[in-house]
Amino acid sequence: LGATERKDGYLEGSGYLVSWCVGHLLELAQPEAYKEQYAKWRYEDLPILPENWKYEVPKDKKTQLALLCRLMKDKRVDSVVCATDAGREGELIFRLVYEYAGCNKPMERLWISSMEDAAIREGFDHLRPGSDYDKLYDAAVCRAGADWLIGINATRLFSVLYGVTLNVGRVMSPTLALLVQRESDIESFISKPFYVPEITCGGFTASGEKMTERSEAEKIRMDCDHNSAFVRSVEKQVKTIQPPRLYDLTTLQRECNRIYGYTAQQTLDYVQSLYEKKLATYPRTDSQYLTKDMQATAASLILWLRDNMPFGKGCAGEPDIDRVT
């Protein structure tokens, strides 16, 4: 963009002012912001259901938020570009600041999944109307509200009932329940022997169904001993095994845990670092597909890997990018 002149909290140049958010600059306020009596955890006050959401600014984010508000109101600024992460949370981070600043200037959206210079330039050449992502913003607000309602009310309820702080969350609690159920299943599991009759005919082995009674399996074995077997029919099928899809964050986290023993957070930290170094696409996604504008880049990258990396030897043909976009 040519914004190379460094200022206090932003960059300037070539008609652009470029600044940044440091995570969420606005957060949903705690219950006591709605009523002072909510400062104490009491059963009688539940459920707490705000009619309109209030937001508060973390102390360490006040300076940057004030700067962004000032820049949006700058008379030199005639439009605003949202360039946060291409996802629900990125949309929420920007929109809350935009609304908090009372900004009504035209807003456009930079939607890219790569930090490469070419991808960024391409994205700025094809900015989209901010209104295209209104539903995404609505979804983010709903997610944040649901987390607040369940987390605040359920945590206070169970903490008051049991006399100890018990944290409850929309995602955390069901996940914990799955772990508890799995652990319970493992502890209560009782192994039982089973038997599978098999017939070996040269290089071919035919297997029967599992049996829990040894006597049944023994009877089949005795009936087959010293007798001949006949192949009555042969059915041949040609099957195509599709290659796996691209990774989304959850799939990648599972794979890295299985192979390397990484925690989910470790995997996210590593792939986030790769993303910032322009070596991976946007990681915080549940999609296993690339956007259409990445087709050419993806194809050229695969061809380069095929021609220059040891594992590419023997690969032939052209990559079918349509499968992953």
Question: What does each model-found stretch correspond to?
Answer:
Residues 84, 254, 284:
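Short glycine-centered, acidic/aromatic-flanked micro-motifs in structured strand/loop junctions
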Residues 84, 111, 133, 243-244, ...:
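Alpha-helix capping and helix-loop boundary segments enriched in small/acidic/polar residues
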Residues 100-105, 128, 153, 157, ...:
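A generic secondary-structure signal for well-formed alpha-helical elements
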Residues 139-169:
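Amphipathic alpha-helical segments of the small helical/lid subdomains adjacent to P-loop NTPase cores
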